[in-house]
Amino acid sequence: NRRERYTLAQLNDMRGVFGTRPYRAPNDPCCVVAVQNFKGGVGKSTLAVHLAQYLAIRGYRVALVDCDSQASATTLFGYVPDLDLTEHDTLYPFLREGERSSLDYALRKTHFDGLELIPANLRLFNSEYELAARMAQGNGALLDRLKEGIESISDRFDVVVMDPPPALGAISLSVLRAAN
């Protein structure tokens, strides 16, 4: 069999050489997509992962943000969330501390060229209670914290896909506010 085989990285290199790799103009905003439904078990995580993979295969630079403490999207990339990851590998420190100015610390390369993941694990659920308690004290700006985080990494990506939890909680509301 004399068929040539190419990796996605090689295809993206060829797209770069021939000028066919999709890109967004520097003044165009990053597309932020939320695959959201308030019911569980309807395929949100599967759809979010497949959308992110499809866009990466097409040559786009994609970030997938797993905002769900069930961590289904994270699991689909080969992680055992509560064994392989700590809370410091997720959105949790960014949402909780307010000390971090960017989500760069949480980005992880995947086996898809052009696709990076911000993973989740069960400890991310703690942020639901913490955000709700702090918002009850009058700090409604916390709902925009995730949007600020997405903006901090948006210059590196064409598309950001978010996989929120199946509930109408603080994280879900933050995801809605961050999506465009």
Where would I find each of the regions flagged by the language model?
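P-loop NTP-binding core
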Residues: 2-179
